[in-house]
Curated annotation (Swiss-Prot):
It is an enzyme of class 1 (oxidoreductase). The keyword Iron does not apply. This is Dihydroorotate dehydrogenase A (fumarate). The gene is pyrD. Belongs to the dihydroorotate dehydrogenase family. Type 1 subfamily. It comes from Lactiplantibacillus plantarum (strain ATCC BAA-793 / NCIMB 8826 / WCFS1) (Lactobacillus plantarum).
Length: 305
């Protein structure tokens, strides 16, 4: 096993760095800017049962220390992803592990999309985006209620034959009960954290800077929050954790590992710097040398036991 190699729920990744869902879409555009085969894995855009047009523009805005986005789950739908997007990745990058991100507005939609996503041979893990509003319960996000998280996780796990990672929302009073609810439902791992709900207002127009009003805050501003939440959850579970939130440098990666992560995703850093993922991968060995880390597996053993 190499210095950077990690294992997530039985799936081997040659390094721990992958773009967060949405930042690489389905890989085709990012492939024009960097060698996707250098990535540890690729998380595709959150996909729903039917195509979604997304929210009206503007959908993104830069803030003091990050980005606000309200894309609205814009995607071509699972049937297109199975027929076009995933086969393209399988043809051009046959050895690249794909993490299929699943979204939905109901239990039935989540299960149906997860079942289809899991049927793709190059999808090795499923990541379930539970920040979506539950249309059957007044629009409350699925990921804010422990009982709902357990029930949804159970339903998806029962329907698929691939490991299921639940992507946790930080927009809760305490994220630990949500993580434990996912574990109780049979999750193979956790991805954390999703964006924090934020807002910006244009002083000249007196209107929100995003057409949707609110949006998800990502970037350097949320990194300390992600570190704290990963640390808190790690005290209560042995499940593998994919850490996400303000990762810009190799040092950020190692900080997540010290908090209890097993792998990382890079989101906002790619907006102004498309090669952020591969640059971080290239810089990891030197950062590990600087801090006396022989391998990531050894660091996981040191931190997690």
């Amino acid at each position: 096993m190499g210095r950077l190699t990690v294992n997530l729920a039985g799936v081997t990744f040659k390094n721990p760095v992958m773009p967060a869902s949405g930042t690489a879409a389905y890989g085709q555009q990012m492939a024009q800017q960097l060698d996707l085969s250098a990535l540890g894995g690729l998380v595709i855009k959150s996909t729903t049962a039917e195509p979604k047009a997304g929210n009206p523009r503007p959908t993104t805005a830069e803030t003091t220390a990050g980005w606000l986005n309200a894309i609205g789950l814009k995607n071509p739908g699972i049937d297109n992803v199975l027929a076009d997007k995933l086969p393209w990745l399988a043809t051009h990058y046959p050895d690249l592990p794909i993490i299929g991100s699943v979204a939905g507005a109901s239990f039935d939609e989540y299960v149906a999309v997860a079942r289809k996503m899991a049927s793709a041979p190059n999808v090795k893990l499923l990541e379930i985006n539970i920040s979506c509003p539950n249309v059957d319960h007044g629009g409350l996000a699925f990921g804010t209620d422990p009982a709902t998280v357990t029930a949804l996780t159970k339903a998806i796990v029962a329907a698929v034959d691939k490991p299921v990672f639940m992507k946790l929302t930080p927009n809760v009073t305490d994220i630990v009960p949500i993580a434990l609810a996912a574990e109780a439902g049979g999750a193979a791992g956790l991805t954390m954290i999703n964006t924090l709900t934020g807002m910006g207002i244009d002083l000249a127009t007196r209107q929100p800077i995003l057409a949707h009003g609110t949006g998800g805050l990502s970037g350097k501003a949320i990194h300390p929050l992600a570190v704290r939440m990963i640390h808190d959850v790690r005290q209560h579970t042995k499940l593998p954790i994919i850490g996400v939130g303000g990762v810009f440098t190799p040092a950020d990666v190692l900080e997540f590992y010290l908090a209890g992560a097993n792998a990382v995703q890079v989101g906002a850093a790619t907006y102004g710097h498309p090669t952020a993922c591969t640059d971080i991968i290239a810089g990891l060995p030197a950062a590990m040398d600087q801090y006396g880390i022989t391998s990531l597996q050894a660091l996981i053993q040191e931190v997690q036991g």
